[in-house]
A protein has these predicted regions:
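Alpha/beta-hydrolase fold nucleophile elbow
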Residues: 94-105
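A short loop-to-beta-strand scaffold at the N-terminal edge of the catalytic core in hydrolase folds
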Residues: 3-14
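Glycine-rich nucleophile elbow surrounding the catalytic serine of serine-hydrolase chemistry
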Residues: 103-113
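Alpha/beta-hydrolase active-site loop
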Residues: 71-91
Length: 204
């Protein structure tokens, strides 16, 4: 909804049956909606109308690989607007059934933010891989982010923020840290992530 990019979305559903609900998937950082294909197919088989989209700066919602990880001037504000647009589309396609919003990792934080403003528009929410930090750490992260933007601009990259967030998880797996072992216990999932160009980029 920034007037520049076409937001890529995907739907999974069985048109021959009566849907028992809508499931909107909100993906996490450094991934894209079609990674959820196997799960979404299962949910569609169970009777759900499943929908999701690639956030701005992710997957196919970019105009080129160089835009991966770039959030633009409004950043997460646009992500929330896109989530609401997708919700409206799904509600129109499958009205009068329970509406559930599922967020994974970064997506869980977006869903939490969405619920603050529009919680009455959904019937339920599933938060996977979410978390909470102490207020002093949150303030430190914000200060670091603002300092980085002042120095490098909004599309800059902060190694310090990486270490404070995602890259810091690797410390728990020192023998295999570079493979992103913290993401999954399944070796094939880790290998797929390393070989996927849509998952190997730096966040602005």
């Amino acid at each position: 909804m920034d007037g520049i990019h076409m937001i890529h979305g995907y739907r999974w559903y069985d048109p021959s049956r009566k849907w028992i609900g809508v499931l909107q998937i909100v993906h996490g950082m450094l991934e894209y909606i079609e990674r959820y294909d196997e799960f979404a197919e299962k949910m569609a088989e169970a009777g759900y109308y499943v929908i999701g989209h690639d956030h701005l700066g992710h997957g196919d919602s970019v105009n080129g690989a160089e835009e991966l990880g770039k959030l633009g001037e409004e950043g997460a504000v646009l992500w929330l607007k896109d989530m609401e647009l997708v919700r409206r589309m799904a509600s129109a396609a499958a009205p009068k059934v329970p509406y559930i919003m599922l967020g994974h990792s970064m997506g869980s934080y977006l869903v939490r933010r969405y619920l603050i403003y529009h919680g009455e528009r959904v019937d339920g929410a599933i938060l996977m891989g979410t978390g909470q930090q102490r207020l002093p750490l949150v303030k430190l992260g914000l200060l670091t982010a603002y300092a980085g933007m002042f120095r490098d601009g909004r599309n800059g990259h902060s190694r310090i923020l990486d270490l404070m967030s995602v890259s810091g998880f690797a410390k728990r797996y020192p023998d295999n840290a570079r493979t992103g072992s913290w993401m999954s216990r399944n070796p094939q999932v880790l290998l797929d992530a390393l070989q996927d160009s849509k998952r190997n980029f730096h966040f602005s």
